[in-house]
């Protein structure tokens, strides 16, 4: 009985998802962002990209700012595209490293969640609410 009434709180559910994932991505992104050039070089270099320091910095910045934007629901779909890019990079890194499914499964799961959220929108408890 109680569970059937929860659909009227779907916007609250979206808030929980946004804040939970946003905080997690900020906590993962901040150390990468503040670690400096050597970290950025490693992030970008692990993917075999040209100018690895630039791509590594962009990945770290996307992870941190994407998380922040997710929390507030501001530029929500832009944030999701940034985070999908970060997860695609993580998947690529793990596949190239030969880590197997267990190595990239978490990044794939998050990419799928972010892709789904592109269609739901941020919910009414957000800056982007309509």
Task: Label each residue range with its predicted role.
Residues 1-34, 53-61, 65-130:
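Extended, low-polarity transmembrane helix blocks
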């Amino acid at each position: 009985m109680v569970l059937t009434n929860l659909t009227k709180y779907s916007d609250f559910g979206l808030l929980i998802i946004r804040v939970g994932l946003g905080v997690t991505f900020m906590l993962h992104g901040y150390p990468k962002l503040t670690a400096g050039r050597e970290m950025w070089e490693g992030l970008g270099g692990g993917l075999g990209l040209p100018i690895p320091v630039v791509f590594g910095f962009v990945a770290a910045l996307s992870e941190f700012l994407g998380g922040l934007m997710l929390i507030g629901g501001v530029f929500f779909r832009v944030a999701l595209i940034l985070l999908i890019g970060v997860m695609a990079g993580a998947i690529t890194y793990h596949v190239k490293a030969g880590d197997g499914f267990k190595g990239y499964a978490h990044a794939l799961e998050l990419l799928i969640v972010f892709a789904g959220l592109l269609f739901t929108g941020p919910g009414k408890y957000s800056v982007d609410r309509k």
